[in-house]
Amino acid sequence: GVQTCALPIYFNSEKAYDMLKKLNINPNDKLKTMSKGTKEKVQLILVMSREAKLYFLDEPIAGVDPAARDYILNTILTNYNEDATIIITTHLISDIERILDDVIFISHGEIALEKTVDEIREDEGKSVDSLFREVFKC
């Protein structure tokens, strides 16, 4: 699921309606009639329309088709508050690696690695996805 944290939270309905329109999603449609990918997009639109200092996105691209993944990642990149921090939990590292600045690997509740993407590439000589697979034996 997608969540956000901030007090107070300001919701920009104009931004939300604009994103819905770009995707040809009728704001009057019921969620139960939408596909999983469309529901994920609507959830993300609702989150990214908030003016928050911290966005927590829990597996935002899990279980959606590649086109929906691209839309979700582009929505994250183009609609968040630039003064905000975005925390993304995911197992789909290769799909989000291009948008990452910093990486934390957590194993059994402990931090296994904490580096910038550039440090991983320079120090380890590999992609974040390759290092993830190595650390977690995927």
Q: What function would you assign to each model-found segment?
A:
Residues 1-7:
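Short, small-residue-biased leader/transition segments that mark boundaries at the very start
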Residues 69-82:
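Helical segment within the ABC ATPase nucleotide-binding domain
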Residues 114-115:
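ABC ATPase "signature
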Residues 84-92:
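Conserved H-loop
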